[in-house]
Amino acid sequence: TLRRALALRHMELPVGDFIRDALASEVPFLAREILESNVQDEIKHDRALGYVADAWGVDPKAEREALALRDAWTEHPDHTILKAMVAERAIFFVLLPFMRFAGDAGMRTVSADISRDEQVHVATNSLVCRELGLEASPSLDKLRKATIAWVMQPLGKSSDKYLDKKFWLDSSDRLMYEGKAPQLSDTQRARMPAFFEHANQNLPQYA
């Protein structure tokens, strides 16, 4: 499962491209500078996750399937800034805590660093989507569900909720529909301060 999560690092640069494409359209002027900074963050995230993948090794089948998912996100017709927001809020905000629970020290450190950036990204993208009146289509939501289900597919039912597939799928659903996932509040007891301990009314809430 961790190697599937790592394989989705291939989504980092496309998310940056989604934001870059949006900058060429109707994005509000005041949001442009921070969105341009977010694009640079995605490049750094791709590099950092690449180092982790090198250390862990990759699953060739998972890599191929992740690239197919990346292409599906790229080709989806919804607005690019909306795709970026959904991917970061309801996919990455699930995978990063999963890496913190299931990964080694290096993976936990990288996920914490990325998380601090992602809180800004989601806040910015959410505000831009609201300003433009954008809402995810049913087909984009279906793609979101398929993506997180693919990552967590190797997990089954477990008495340890952090190894239970339904726990993570439900977390993605709640982040998508409610903007919060209270079931992830235990991450506040992880070794390092988690990104979702920072108060921001525009962010998904975990507690």
What are the functions of these language-model segments?
Residues T1-A207:
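Non-heme di-metal
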